[in-house]
């Protein structure tokens, strides 16, 4: 597991492209047959990919977290963006097709991941945050979620937002997690943009062609910067930063947030004339 530290807006004012990428971009999220995780000190979120092939995988981080087992004091969100697979939670095994999700509460002792076909492995994207209360484990299917439809073809930002871990779907301590799909012909996400000082966020972009690129916008509204990202890469968004993106073609992304509250609409909108 890689550790990333926090930064003030003043810290990144003079960062080079390489420095910015080193601090906020995760280039390899899904590694076949392996677990690839990042621990960010922004609200102590752990996120990354679990990509089982021939053998099942289990996240073991007791020493790193100073606990007896991974979810002793944490809650976990999972969404599969790859081939069909399985998740086993304290001995109970469930199938997980593409776009299936799971909320797993604190004090769950074992979570094991496996794939149905090693040649088409499941790709489990996970987000894990500190938790103070144990809530029930809930399997979540995209078919059961009524998407929030937003944007407009004229502004190139028409998209569907599927809220997986959200008060309308399941209980959680502070984790929110969802899946956004852009409509054909749209390129922008989260524009007009916003910040939310009370929550950090992490994005992973996927379902992209090899030569498609995302220009992920970040920074204070009056001093923006960007990361150029390719398929299945992730970005860390501190609470003070905008988080928006535009693609050279279609894409999807998973977002995950944690912080002071679980109010999805608690955000500070940024007027277009404030952007620089």
From Swiss-Prot:
Q: Which family does it belong to?
A: Belongs to the KduI family.
Which species expresses this protein natively?
A: Enterococcus faecalis (strain ATCC 700802 / V583)
Q: Which SUPFAM superfamilies match?
A: RmlC-like cupins (SSF51182)
Q: Does the keyword Isomerase apply?
A: yes
One Pfam family name from the record?
KduI
Pathway where this protein functions: Glycan metabolism; pectin degradation; 2-dehydro-3-deoxy-D-gluconate from pectin: step 4/5
In the record, biological process GO terms are:
D-galacturonate catabolic process; D-glucuronate catabolic process; pectin catabolic process
As recorded in Swiss-Prot or TrEMBL, the protein's gene is named kduI1
Domain of life from the UniProt record? Bacteria
**What does the Swiss-Prot or TrEMBL cofactor note state?**
Binds 1 zinc ion per subunit.
Q: Could you say which residues form the signal peptide?
A: none
Spell out the reaction equation it catalyses: 5-dehydro-4-deoxy-D-glucuronate = 3-deoxy-D-glycero-2,5-hexodiulosonate
**UniProt-annotated binding residues for Zn(2+):** 194, 196, 201, 243
Protein name in UniProt: 4-deoxy-L-threo-5-hexosulose-uronate ketol-isomerase 1
Q: Which GO terms describe its molecular function?
A: 4-deoxy-L-threo-5-hexosulose-uronate ketol-isomerase activity; zinc ion binding
PANTHER family per record = 4-DEOXY-L-THREO-5-HEXOSULOSE-URONATE KETOL-ISOMERASE
Q: Which HAMAP family match?
A: KduI
Transferase in keyword set? no
Which coenzymes or cofactors are required? Zn(2+)
**Which UniProt keyword terms apply here?**
Isomerase, Metal-binding, Zinc
**Enzyme kind, highest EC tier:** isomerase
Enzyme Commission (EC) number: 5.3.1.17
Role according to the record: Catalyzes the isomerization of 5-dehydro-4-deoxy-D-glucuronate to 3-deoxy-D-glycero-2,5-hexodiulosonate.
């Amino acid at each position: 597991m890689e550790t990333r530290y926090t930064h003030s807006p003043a810290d990144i004012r003079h960062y080079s492209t390489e420095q910015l990428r080193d601090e906020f971009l995760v280039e390899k999220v899904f590694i076949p047959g392996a677990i690839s995780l990042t621990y960010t000190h922004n609200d102590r979120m752990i996120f990354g990919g679990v990509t089982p092939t021939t053998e099942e995988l289990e996240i073991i981080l007791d020493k790193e977290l100073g606990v007896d087992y991974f979810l002793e004091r944490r809650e976990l969100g999972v969404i599969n963006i790859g081939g069909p697979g399985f998740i086993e939670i304290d001995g109970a095994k469930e199938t997980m097709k593409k776009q299936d999700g799971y909320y797993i509460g604190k004090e769950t002792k074992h979570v094991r991941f496996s794939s149905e076909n090693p040649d088409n492995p499941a790709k489990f994207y996970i987000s894990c945050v500190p938790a103070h209360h144990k809530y029930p484990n809930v399997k979540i299917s995209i078919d059961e979620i009524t998407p929030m439809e937003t944007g407009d073809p004229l502004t190139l930002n028409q998209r569907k937002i599927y809220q997986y871990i959200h008060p309308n779907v399941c209980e959680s301590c502070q984790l929110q997690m969802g899946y956004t799909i852009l409509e054909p012909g749209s390129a922008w996400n989260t524009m007009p943009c916003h910040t939310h000082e009370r929550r950090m966020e992490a994005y992973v972009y996927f379902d992209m062609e090899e030569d498609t690129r995302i220009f992920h916008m970040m920074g204070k509204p009056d001093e923006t910067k960007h990361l150029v990202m390719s398929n299945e890469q992730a970005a860390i968004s501190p609470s003070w930063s905008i988080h928006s993106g535009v693609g050279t073609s279609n894409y999807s992304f998973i977002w995950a947030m944690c912080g002071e509250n679980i109010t999805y609409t608690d955000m500070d909108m940024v007027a277009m004339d404030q952007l620089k």
